[in-house]
């Protein structure tokens, strides 16, 4: 159950980052204030809940094991950036993502 909490904390953290990115997207000047307030409010909510879940994780998992698992954030953000904003990702970046996943698998298998 705690590993599910860790994944959920990671996903909420990523959601918060993505909301911040969305807040920077161009909108008409008359809608800008509401747009920014909405997305930054959602970002704060996601990041706040992620922090609470992270504290639960740290109560149950050694920080040396738990913290590297947050590297999943790099993977989630890359996938979301491609899907949501059609951002280009170089082969070198994908290679880095593969190394991150490999590192997480290696570290996770020690538990």
UniProtKB/Swiss-Prot annotation:
Topology with respect to the bilayer: Multi-pass membrane protein
Transmembrane feature ranges: 38-58, 61-81, 88-108
Chief subcellular location: membrane
Cytoplasmic membrane side: 1-37, 82-87
InterPro entries the UniProt entry points to: EamA_dom, Flippase_ArnE, Small_drug/metabolite_transptr
Pfam families: EamA
Span of domain EamA: 40-109
The protein, known as: Probable 4-amino-4-deoxy-L-arabinose-phosphoundecaprenol flippase subunit ArnE
Organism: Escherichia coli (strain 55989 / EAEC)
